[in-house]
Amino acid sequence: MNQEVMNLFNPTAPTQTFDQIKISIASPERILSWSYGEIKKPETINYRTFKPERDGLFCARIFGPIKDYECLCGKYKRMKYKGIICEKCGVEVTLSKVRRERMGHIELAAPVAHIWFLKSLPSRIGLLLDMTLKDLERVLYFENYIVLEPGLTSLKERQLLTEEEYIDAQDQYGEDSFTAGIGAEAIRELMMALDLEKIAADLRVEIAESTSELKPKKLAKRLKLIEAFIESGNKPEWMIMTQIPVIPPELRPLVPLDGGRFATSDLNDLYRRVINRNNRLKRLMELRAPDIIIRNEKRMLQESVDALFDNGRRGRVITGANKRPLKSLADMLKGKQGRFRQNLLGKRVDYSGRSVIVVGPELKLHQCGLPKKMALELFKPFIYSRLEAKGLSATVKQAKKLVEKERPEVWEILEQVIREHPVLLNRAPTLHRLGIQAFEPVLIEGKAIQLHPLVCAAFNADFDGDQMAVHVPLSLEAQLEARVLMMSTNNILHPANGSPIIVPSQDIVLGLYYVTIQKDNEPGEGMVFGSVSEIEHALAVKAVTLHAKVKARYTTKDADGNSYTEVVDTTPGRMMVGELLPRHPNVPFDLVNRLLTKRDISKMIDVVYRHCGQKETVIFCDQIMALGFRQAFRAGISFGKDDMVIPEEKAKLVEETQTLATEYEQQYIDGLITQGEKYNKVVDAWAKCTDRVADVMMQKISAVQIDPETKREKQINSIYMMAHSGARGSPAQMKQLAGMRGLMAKPSGEIIETPIISNFKEGLTVLEYFNSTHGARKGLADTALKTANSGYLTRRLVDVAQDSIITEEDCGTIGGITVQPVIEAGDVIVSLGTRVLGRTTAEDVMNPATGEVLIPKNHLIDEADVDTIEEANVQGIKIRSVLTCEAANGVCGACYGRDLARGTPVNMGEAVGVIAAQSIGEPGTQLTMRTFHIGGTAQVVDSSFIESNHAGTIKIVNRNVVKDSNGVLVVMGRNVQVQIIDEHGGERASHKLTYGSRLKFDDGDKIERGQRISEWDPYTMPMLTEVNGIAEFEDLVDGVSIREVADEATGISSRVVVDWRASPRGSDLRPAVVVKDKNGKILKLANGNDARYLLSVDAILSVDNGAAVHAGDVLARIPTEGAKTRDITGGLPRVAELFEARRPKDHAIIAEATGRVEFGKDYKNKRRIIVHPVDESLEPIEYLIPKGKHISVQEGDVIEKGEFILDGHPAPHDILAISGVEELAAYLVNEVQDVYRLQGVAINDKHIEVIVRNMLQKVEVTSPGESITLPGEQLDRAEFDEMNAKLEAQGKTPATAVPVLLGITKASLQTRSFISAASFQETTRVLTEAAVSGKVDQLVGLKENVIVGRLIPAGTGGMLQRLRGEAQNRDDKILEDQGGATPTASTEIKEPAEGAA
């Protein structure tokens, strides 16, 4: 107790507030200033007395007493001797916790190189001295001498000499004529002799004068390091240590176990080795031992210090007694178990508990059920203080007894304590911020936590044994934040897409679906009801059923808020739901007057939230939930095996397809089609068959059946109800239950040709069962692997985006990006309205027909505006985007737009970066877990025709078509587009036509909805002739460039172009088909070139030598890949590839300028393509393309800047360089969205944009102007702008730079904050780099602040920082006003302050 009393009298000094943290290399003086004494002996603790040995690693004299206020020998005990140093044992009487703070040091007998600066690549010592790492190690580990001072001899400075050479040189030149050294001492002398300023100046000159490509890069690296040393004030020789600090003993504890053994930290072993070797070296030096022995001892000392700092970085790993590698200081920081990630970013929490969750349907949305036992334990301190306040107990001990006995008054007090005190519930894995929410606890019996059913979706929880953790917010501020920000009722919308996340599912959906069914000829049809109570009465006496068609009176409000009633045609069930709807003019009864599926319910909740606000929505959701559960229970829906109806038509359909497959097989045997074409066709046929069986089955199951006697409709099929309502199951699963399972994929992703004809009801044959195991097993394996991958992706995303915070209301930029609807194969997949909802306009939005302003600029687009945009049929809108935001640090509110989770403009201090990362990462994990649900059934992703979705007139842009010999229109151009124009002349749809597709309509034709515009063969890419004439082969040498490939199965041969470069004879062949006229002259094409069509490898010839061809005929076909299934497996790695900005394997080659294409002279095995730009001032651009790749342009084509010369995925860096930031952003956003859309996951574009903004935070200097930067140097965009602003202020030429795209891992490691980077990856490298350049961390991001233990500068934590900043500015202004007479003085004071910081 006396300890506490004392603490009242001397309150501990509050920790000093600090604004930044600097890291640099410790000088020997600095190390000594930390130390409380030198450690001379390797001993630790006396094993009999358990007292620390004097001058040893645990010495009490150096580090402080073991017991509070008690010296070692026991002469001084108690507080009153505080601060006295005992004359007998030399220990200061003070708190024992100083043993956690005080450091010691070891005085080394010989200097030692710090391994981090030596071995962490690039080696800093090596760069400084301009020596290779190999040479350095030779000197440091005593293999070679190095010449320090050649004197008048013919030796060179820094020349390495072996032992023999050194002795020879001494003999030859005399011992004193030159100096050579060995070991760290020699390196240290070289370091001390460096004149950094001079070297820097020399290097600058050298870089300016150098002509080669690589040299300046190398020199620039060295120059950068030297400048870092000059700027930071670090001295190079500090990288060689003469003292070693020893960390406090409590941080490397030694604990006696029973049985006389000790458990110790590995560091003690490592320190002991260093001390032993150091002492031995000292003794040998005193004894004047032979040089070779001393050298050996010094080498061993160097090795032991290396092991202490970073064990295993060089040479063998030092192991302990049990053969396990010892954990060195570097290992303490590194990795998931290191200091950063284990203790600083991932702390454990007191006042928490965990238990299994069960469903609590009678809870309100803001409540959770907390077991009494748990609550009693968690709220103990509150209960104690209440007991004391009420006078029921005098001491804490008494209170403890009362609580342990569980007296009745304790329960009463617990009820009081718990009232209005929210608790946090968390379910691991916490993938997004909705994984932790606050609830008000309700005490319950039992041992399981009760959870409200509607929040399950947010937690991704189910009740099959999931556990959840409970945390108690203690302080008033914490309770306030929990209630205002984290309460489940405040988190109704999903932060990723702004749709409601509190959506009923499963039983509730089924109940609501059942209630809203409408049937004919029910008892009570046509009755009229005046109120809901009448309906309830009628239902109770069975005068009417839930599903009867009746009329009823519904009361609602008009726009002025007055009530009025209307009579509606509805059913009693729908009236029950309608009764719960909040009354509002914009919430019509039509919302519930329909068959409610999950999607309708979600829409209904969304509408209610937008118009009636949060409170109404929460009440409404709770009521719907209760109704849904009650009705599902009353309905008693169940299903049996007979509910799975297998259609009779199945046998017929299967038989038809079987004959088709046999027919294709026969065609293949006859040699009419290739193996690949047969495979594709068979797979196609079976996929169609499966779909048709599924359709027939769905019609069968969903058909309404009438009972002949009562004329009433029969009960709807239960399985259909479940799937159709969205409660459970999907058509895909029903197809497998009662249709046919269909095609299966091999583990490689290829589709097996033979489908599974049976369904689960019939049962699979052994062979079918075996085929289906592939998919099932792959699904399970995928799940395990990808959960980890997805988690890692989220971690990288969070790390790159963590310092994107809303820092200002509006940055005032005029920039923005233009957004258009997403159209695929003519379908509008994402409408323009959906894409711009919640964004700020960058320009006025005009009505394309009338030209009037629909929405002014700088206006936040809401739902009403979206309707306006859709009605006016606007095609594109320029909106503000975080990509073009000009806020100095963070992002501004106007560029970000709406906060999706609240539906309001985003607040200041919102951590939008983390929200973006979670929104992208969270579904990744969800999706990876969802691969095996469809049991690996293959879905062929393919389209081979375009259908019109609108009626209108056809308009063909860049029309380049010909009629072939059959009179069919064939597309000959690569950028032909077809547009459908409505009667007002507005463009309804636009499709790009593939080369070689067959057109059904021509320019100006009328088209109806659903008619096919064009068709093409999806399996091959044709090569067409543009002129009529006679086809002749060129360079098609049998056996070299062309082979008759006889199909093994059929014996029929087709002529295939083979890789002609493989044989020596074919090296200069250029296989082609030329078209000649009757006289044998090569015909000319429209663009003036010869009609020569170059062939690529694997092309299959379709014409014979000398055959007559007609324009538009196919000369050759190039087979495309077989259909592989796409599932998120392709997805997750694809998302990672995009965010990491990797170059794809076969990346596309993009034209850098608009120009004419010409084929140059081939180079080895590459084709040379030259683009002659239209703009005369530009040089022609050459591209080398591997032969055999199919090039999508012909000689003489005009290609636009940004178009593909070689198809494939484009490399994002190319898009940035050629088309700019906006194009790059559009590409990345669309590609990422494609992956997620395939899985039906909605993510708002702005989240992806936030990540892309952080990938573009660096710029590369192109011309340095008058700055001190170097060409090719990468700078932070903010740093670059600051630098240029300073240069302009001084009237100097500013530097110019281009944006650089970095992958997320690289961008995270290159943030301005070294603390954040070190806690992410490659800790050693980051810290080494930061220390050398004396980096300062300004603590602006979230992560750095968590690590140093401060509030994060976002949300409520950001408020304090802003206030402090404002106060600081105010003070500065006042000082400036007061010192108005002498402004110069104040500026002078400021300069060194900046420098000092």
Swiss-Prot record:
SMART domains tied to this protein: RPOLA_N (SM00663)
Reported cofactor(s): Mg(2+); Zn(2+)
E.C. no: 2.7.7.6
Any one GO biological process: DNA-templated transcription
Gene3D superfamilies assigned to the protein according to its UniProt record, in alphabetical order: 1.10.132.30, 1.10.150.390, 1.10.1790.20, 1.10.40.90, 2.40.40.20, 2.40.50.100, RNA polymerase II, clamp domain, RNA polymerase Rpb1, domain 3
Pfam families: RNA_pol_Rpb1_1 (PF04997), RNA_pol_Rpb1_2 (PF00623), RNA_pol_Rpb1_3 (PF04983), RNA_pol_Rpb1_4 (PF05000), RNA_pol_Rpb1_5 (PF04998)
Keywords: DNA-directed RNA polymerase, Magnesium, Metal-binding, Nucleotidyltransferase, Transcription, Transferase, Zinc
Membrane-spanning parts: none
CDD domains named among the record's database cross-references: RNAP_beta'_C, RNAP_beta'_N
Region entry Disordered, spans: 1368-1397
Cofactor details (free text): Binds 1 Mg(2+) ion per subunit.
Catalysed reactions, as listed in the record: RNA(n) + a ribonucleoside 5'-triphosphate = RNA(n+1) + diphosphate
Enzyme class, UniProt record, top EC level: transferase
Binding site for Zn(2+) 2: 811, 885, 892, 895
Gene Ontology MF annotations: DNA binding; DNA-directed RNA polymerase activity; magnesium ion binding; zinc ion binding
Family according to the record: Belongs to the RNA polymerase beta' chain family.
NCBIfam families: rpoC_TIGR
This protein's name: DNA-directed RNA polymerase subunit beta'
Lineage of the species this protein comes from: Bacteria, Pseudomonadati, Pseudomonadota, Alphaproteobacteria, Hyphomicrobiales
Gene designation: rpoC
